[in-house]
Amino acid sequence: NKKYYDFILNISEDGWFGKSIGPKQHLAHSIFRSIEEGKNVIRSTNNGISAFVNPKGQIIKQISEKGYFDVNKIKRVDKTYFAEHGNKIFFYFVLIYTTFIVILKIRENK
């Protein structure tokens, strides 16, 4: 009995990045997770970029200074293929590719 949550909460301490591109990369990772899982992401940081990202990867609200924002409604979204099956799709691609290569090698040796 797995529970399905409507959002991902990402809490991060980005202070050690300094003035580098690190906080932007962390935000980008959150965007990818929202698309991958088909969930809203609420990202809270102390020295980085806090944001609310919808399941399509669009940044709805964002702040990079001290402050806060309210998230009023989080809509439930259906699971994506990746959320349902995980990395199985990559296994299938490798299996198909390997089978294809083996068939080519067998034909080449005839």
Feature-to-residue mapping (PLM):
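CN hydrolase (nitrilase-like) catalytic-core segments centered on the catalytic cysteine
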Residues: 1-69
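Surface-exposed beta-strand edges and their flanking turn/coil or helix-capping segments
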Residues: 22-24, 56-57, 82-86, 96-98
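Short, charged/polar low-complexity linear motifs in solvent-exposed/disordered segments
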Residues: 36, 77-78, 108-110
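Short, surface-exposed, charge-dense and proline/glycine-enriched linear segments
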Residues: 39-44, 71-78, 96
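Short, aromatic-rich amphipathic segments at membrane interfaces
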Residues: 66-90
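Selective detector of the "anchor" transmembrane alpha-helix that sits immediately C-terminal
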Residues: 84-109
